[in-house]
C-alpha cells in the first residue's frame, strides 16, 4: 500500500514537495506513482539554474513497461538535481520520499502552494482514480 507522509505537499500529477526552507523545496514522484510505473530503469532530470513554470515538463522517468513525464508543481529556479539517480534510478522505487528525490527548486510565489494537495486530499484523488 502506498504511503503519503503528512508533512508533504502533493500535486494532481503525482509529484510531492517537501519544504526545506522558506523558498526551497525538494520534489519527487509519489510512492503511488512509482508503484504504478514499476521498476525504474532511467531518469532524465532537468538542468540546474533554469527557470520552470508550474505545469512545465521537467523530467522523465522510465520503467520496464512505460515512460512518464514529471511536471513541476511549482514555478521557480531549479537549483540542484539528484545526480545519484543517473546510476541508480531504482532508488526512486526503494525510497521515493528520501534518497529518491528528483530535484530542488527555489520557488517564485508561495501562493502556488494553495493549488496543491495535503496527504488526505491526495489519498482522496488516488481513490477516485481507482
From Swiss-Prot:
NCBIfam families for the chain: gcvH, PRK01202.1
Organism whose genome encodes this protein: Coxiella burnetii (strain RSA 493 / Nine Mile phase I)
Function description: The glycine cleavage system catalyzes the degradation of glycine. The H protein shuttles the methylamine group of glycine from the P protein to the T protein.
GO biological process: glycine decarboxylation via glycine cleavage system
Protein name in the entry: Glycine cleavage system H protein
Co-factor note (free text): Binds 1 lipoyl cofactor covalently.
Segments forming domain Lipoyl-binding: 24-106
Cofactor: (R)-lipoate
Gene: gcvH
Amino acid at each position: 500500500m502506498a504511503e503519503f507522509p503528512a508533512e508533504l505537499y502533493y500535486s494532481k500529477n503525482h509529484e510531492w514537495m517537501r519544504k526545506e526552507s522558506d523558498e526551497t523545496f525538494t520534489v519527487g514522484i509519489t510512492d503511488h506513482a512509482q508503484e504504478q510505473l514499476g521498476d525504474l530503469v532511467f531518469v532524465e532530470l532537468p538542468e540546474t539554474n533554469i527557470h520552470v513554470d508550474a505545469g512545465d515538463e521537467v523530467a522523465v522517468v522510465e520503467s520496464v513497461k512505460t515512460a512518464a513525464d514529471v511536471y513541476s508543481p511549482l514555478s521557480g529556479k531549479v537549483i540542484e538535481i539528484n545526480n545519484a539517480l543517473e546510476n541508480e534510478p531504482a532508488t526512486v522505487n526503494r525510497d521515493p520520499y528520501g534518497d529518491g528525490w528528483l530535484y530542488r527548486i527555489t520557488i517564485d510565489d508561495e501562493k502556488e502552494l494553495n493549488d496543491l494537495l495535503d496527504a488526505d486530499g491526495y489519498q482522496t484523488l488516488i481513490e477516485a482514480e481507482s
